[in-house]
């Protein structure tokens, strides 16, 4: 683990404790919720971890328009009319793709998504599978984890998260970095 953290340290400025906790939670097969204000490097940290671990990364932007169908996927309507319902005409959404591939599903701003969409995620976190009408059961492949991020509740457009979510995740607070780390981030962005 020490070697992995050293490699991650070359991709992510600071955040040593957060990297250690995220890697430990993933190693323990746990889902993760990162809580903190915008611009604190939550997405950057997770992309680096997925890349170093060789795990797929499915990104979902959480907003009021994220329906269960957009998250799960759907049958191609034109092909349903000609061929009927068949597994080969189902178009995977990011959740289904992550389940099948054993990837990380990263839901940004989870506290902005509708309750019915959140309920789909709660079921998948608990059961480690998804049941899709006319398609059947999709079990989570080894490596699948939900990693979500959220801004503080008082941010505009956010909602409180159900305790059912909190019961199923490791929570990690992420705050702004020290001034010298922020300067290093800017220097890296300008140089690279």
Which residues fall in each region the model found?
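AAA+ P-loop NTPase catalytic core and its hallmark functional loops
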Residues: 1-192
């Amino acid at each position: 683990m020490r070697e992995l953290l050293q490699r991650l340290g070359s991709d992510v400025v600071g955040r040593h404790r957060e990297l250690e906790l995220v890697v430990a939670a993933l190693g323990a097969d746990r889902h993760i919720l990162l809580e903190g204000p915008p611009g604190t490097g939550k997405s950057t940290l997770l992309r680096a971890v997925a890349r170093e671990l060789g795990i797929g990364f499915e990104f979902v932007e959480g907003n009021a328009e994220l329906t269960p169908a957009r998250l799960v996927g759907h049958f191609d309507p034109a092909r349903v009319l000609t061929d009927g319902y068949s597994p080969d005409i189902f178009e995977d959404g990011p959740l289904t793709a992550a389940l099948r591939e054993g990837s990380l599903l990263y839901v940004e701003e989870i506290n902005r998504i509708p309750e019915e969409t959140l309920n789909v995620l709660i079921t998948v976190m608990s059961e480690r599978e998804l049941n899709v009408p006319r398609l059947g059961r999709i079990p989570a492949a080894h490596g699948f984890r939900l990693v979500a991020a959220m801004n503080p509740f008082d941010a505009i457009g956010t909602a409180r998260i159900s305790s059912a979510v909190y019961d199923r995740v490791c929570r990690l607070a992420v705050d702004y970095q020290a001034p010298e780390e922020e300067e290093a981030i800017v220097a890296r962005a300008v140089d690279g």
